[in-house]
From Swiss-Prot:
GO terms for molecular function: ATP binding; ATP hydrolysis activity; helicase activity; mRNA binding; RNA binding; RNA helicase activity. Residues 1-74 are annotated as: Disordered. CDD domains: DEXHc_DHX15 (cd17973), SF2_C_RHA (cd18791). Pre-mRNA processing factor involved in disassembly of spliceosomes after the release of mature mRNA. PANTHER family: ATP-DEPENDENT RNA HELICASE (PTHR18934), ATP-DEPENDENT RNA HELICASE DHX15 HOMOLOG (PTHR18934:SF109). This is Pre-mRNA-splicing factor ATP-dependent RNA helicase PRP43. It comes from Saccharomyces cerevisiae (strain ATCC 204508 / S288c). SMART domains: DEXDc, HA2, HELICc. Residues 293-473 form the Helicase C-terminal domain. The modification Phosphoserine is found at residues 8-9. GO terms for cellular component: 90S preribosome; mitochondrion; nucleolus; post-mRNA release spliceosomal complex; small-subunit processome; spliceosomal complex. Changing residue 247 to L: In PRP43-DN2; dominant-negative phenotype. Present with 16900 molecules/cell in log phase SD medium. It catalyses: ATP + H2O = ADP + phosphate + H(+).
């Protein structure tokens, strides 16, 4: 990071310390003087309903007696008629048949592995079985159940709150990044695995919990893998803590071995036979082929809802529009039944996610009404949608890939694994025999799809992970017990990046800046940029830009309306690039004019995504609270000042100095600094001039290498802000190094001239 020279009384020589480092040191001192208040003590109901029962000795019969009573033992209120109806449905789930067997295993072991196919009821029922045995409300503890995805954490918490006849956010709640719907009454908390990891950074023993359930462990997310390694250590220190590892797939022996031969209980799902159909040849346009297949099913097949798997929000929303339009046409022209089409992806607001559980529309003239759910791979195992009889599987999903040599992490549309294909097909056989239409050949399934997806830890940039592990007190990363250890090169890259960001010192120890950066739920690069932004007199603006970078794309560009959408975007465009354009969009969104116009209509007319913008607004507020908590100054430069935009670009360079590209001399495109990758600027950028040097937010791997969300910067800023990274002795020979050498000479000459002038001034003043 860039350095300022700071003199201290203990050190007569100047000590080089970056601005963010100084801010972190001050924040650390202040927090020692004024420690943050700990969380509120838990408050629970106890009117003796559990009297006579012994913790960790509850039988299924005793628990069911409490469930069948008139009074809710967790609230003291009478059960509602709706509760009684739901209880009957719950008792029919496959897990209920094995409640006694589960309890015996749970009571006699500290760690157990539970396998239940999607639809067996494991995610909603097992945590409730645990509550009746743990009695957390009498012990002042909580039960945690982690989910890899936010959507699942929210929707499952809502369902379980209904099942337990309690209010969501009270006895049952959820915690996801930037949203906490729990209270001091909460005894069962559904949360993303990342949120539990953040809690562990503050409380290494997770002392608030008496039982932790890691659900969907087969997904092998980064956070789940780290939690598993961490919990292996915690259980040694906490013999009172119980762990349940839950998986939807039967390859659970690996989990058993990892947890020292933990016992396993498997519960079969309720599945009916599923007929598989393959295409005779490769489908060039899988999206078009998927839409045609859905419409063909609707026109020709018997009653039953359809689940279509696609790769992301844009693709899903496009398909929702097309299927809705063509479905209406089928109703009018062919007399087909009505069609309700619902999207499902991570950034969808909770009330819209819930619509997927609505019943299908009524039949019309004897033709069945149908519900179509178009989802990312979240519907593979995380959520169960009743009524699905037909699955359309194009065979793709978005997967993160990372190349440590060129430090590029990208989301790529890639073929799914055989395990995923089987999970998808299984969704069709939940309520009756179903059909799965695979939009690829049988030969491709047998020969081209890998058996299992690679764990996320093997295909990710590990900077955030290493910072988390350091904050968790794990210094020996080489010997940390990963289920699948990442490549040493990936680990080295992460350590190197964190060292350049001054989050780790040269010995690999956490610095005050690293400790402070780890408090922000952001990529370390963004956290460091935000912490140091006050020095550039623009922390308010950087706060906004960071929030805007943390949400899905705010610009909407419909296929039929590209020209209008581009014209609307140009209203906000700033010639220096996309980051300041995002700032302009946010300011316009928050303006009185937009609200007087009607904010939803304003967003529609300007081709902006209201959901993304309101999410950015929420994230900004939360980050602002963190800034205030750690006494980080919130400031801005006068908008009329000629320095206003330069200050913002300098602050951006202080975070993105490792993501820089230079225009190629005498050739088209750019070349990335240090890694020498040929790249093009993404067509979506608004950069209004041929900038020589740019920072970029992401590297997009498609048929060509693109850099996206770019802003022009001056190379002298980079040398000044990040001298360690721009130590030219570490650069390969070539155009980038030559240019930087020339700029460095120029900067050094200017500095010498300044120093010469200052010496003359001091001589005159002495005279």
């Amino acid at each position: 990071m860039g350095s300022k020279r700071r003199f201290s009384s203990e050190h007569p020589d100047p000590v080089e310390t970056s601005i963010p480092e100084q801010a972190a040191e001050i924040a650390e001192e202040l927090s020692k003087q004024h420690p943050l208040p700990s969380e509120e003590p838990l408050v629970h109901h106890d009117a003796g309903e559990f009297k006579g029962l012994q913790r960790h000795h509850t039988s299924a019969e005793e628990a069911q007696k409490l469930e069948d009573g008139k009074i809710n033992p967790f609230t003291g209120r009478e059960f509602t008629p709706k509760y009684v109806d739901i209880l009957k449905i719950r008792r029919e789930l496959p897990v209920h048949a094995q409640r006694d067997e589960f309890l015996k295993l749970y009571q006699n072991n500290q760690i157990m592995v539970f396998v239940g196919e999607t639809g067996s009821g494991k995610t909603t029922q097992i945590p409730q079985f645990v509550l009746f045995d743990e009695m957390p409300h009498l012990e002042n503890t909580q039960v945690a159940c982690t989910q890899p995805r936010r959507v699942a954490a929210m929707s499952v918490a809502q369902r379980v709150a209904e099942e337990m006849d309690v209010k969501l956010g009270e006895e049952v709640g959820y915690s996801i990044r930037f949203e906490n719907k729990t209270s001091n009454k909460t005894i069962l908390k559904y949360m993303t695995d990342g949120m539990l990891l953040r809690e562990a950074m503050e409380d290494h023993d997770l002392s608030r919990y008496s039982c932790i359930i890691l659900d969907e462990a087969h997904e092998r997310t980064l956070a789940t893998d780290i939690l598993m390694g961490l919990l292996k250590q915690v259980v040694k220190r906490r013999p009172d803590l119980k762990i349940i590892i839950m998986s939807a797939t039967l390859d659970a022996e690996k989990f058993q071995r990892y947890f020292n031969d933990a016992p396993l209980l498997a519960v079969p799902g309720r599945t009916y036979p599923v007929e598989l159909y393959y295409t005779p040849e490769f489908q060039r346009d899988y999206l078009d082929s998927a839409i045609r297949t859905v419409l063909q099913i609707h026109a020709t097949e018997e009653a039953g809802d359809i689940l279509l798997f696609l790769t992301g929000e844009d693709e899903i929303e496009d398909a929702v529009r097309k299927i809705s339009l063509e479905g209406d046409q089928l109703v009018r022209e062919e007399g087909c039944g009505p069609l309700s089409v619902y999207p499902l992806y991570g950034s969808l607001p909770p009330h819209q996610q819930q619509r997927i559980f609505e019943p299908a529309p009524e039949s019309h003239n004897g033709r069945p009404g149908r519900k179509v759910v178009i989802s990312t791979n979240i519907a593979e195992t995380s959520l169960t949608i009743d009524g699905i009889v037909y699955v359309v599987d194009p065979g793709f999903s978005k997967q993160k890939v990372y190349n440590p040599r060129i430090r590029v992490e990208s989301l790529l549309v890639s073929p799914i694994s055989k395990a995923s294909a089987q999970q998808r097909a299984g969704r069709a056989g939940r309520t009756r025999p179903g059909k799965c239409f695979r939009l690829y050949t049988e030969e491709a399934f047998q020969k081209e799809l890998i058996e299992q997806s690679y764990p996320e830890i093997l295909r990710s940039n590990l900077s955030s992970t290493v910072l988390e592990l350091k904050k968790l007190g794990i210094d020996d990363l080489v010997h940390f017990d990963f289920m699948d250890p990442p490549a040493p090169e990936t680990m080295m890259r992460a350590l190197e990046e964190l060292n350049y960001l001054a989050c780790l010192d040269d010995e690999g120890n956490l610095t005050p800046l690293g400790r402070l950066a780890s408090q922000f739920p952001l990529d370390p690069m963004l956290a460091v940029m935000l912490i140091g932004s006050f020095e550039f007199q623009c922390s308010q603006e950087i706060l906004t830009i960071v929030a805007m970078l943390s949400v899905p794309n705010v610009f909407i560009r419909p296929t039929k309306d590209k020209k209008r959408a581009d014209d609307a975007k140009n209203i906000f465009a700033h010639p220096d690039g996309d980051h300041i354009t995002l700032l302009n969009v946010y300011h316009a969104f928050k303006s009185d004019e937009a609200y007087e116009y009607g904010i939803h209509k304003w967003c529609r007319d300007h081709y902006l995504n209201y959901r993304s913008l309101s999410a950015a607004d929420n994230i900004r507020s939360q980050l602002e609270r963190l800034m205030n908590r750690y006494n980080l100054e919130l400031n801005t430069t006068d908008y009329e000042s000629p320095k206003y935009f330069d200050n913002i670009r300098k602050a951006l360079a202080s975070g993105f100095f490792m993501q820089v590209a230079k225009k190629r001399s005498g050739a088209k495109g750019y070349i990335t600094v240090k890694d020498n990758q040929d790249v093009l600027i993404h067509p979506s950028t608004v950069l209004g001039h041929d900038a020589e040097w740019v920072i970029y937010n992401e590297f997009v791997l498609t048929s060509k290498n693109y850099i996206r969300t770019v802003t022009s910067v001056r190379p002298e800023w980079l040398i000044e802000i990040a001298p360690a990274y721009y130590d030219l002795s570490n650069f390969q020979k070539g155009d980038v190094k030559l240019s930087l050498e020339r700029i460095k000479e120029k900067v050094d000459r200017l500095n010498e001239l300044k120093q010469g002038k200052n010496k003359k001034k001091s001589k005159h003043s002495k005279k």
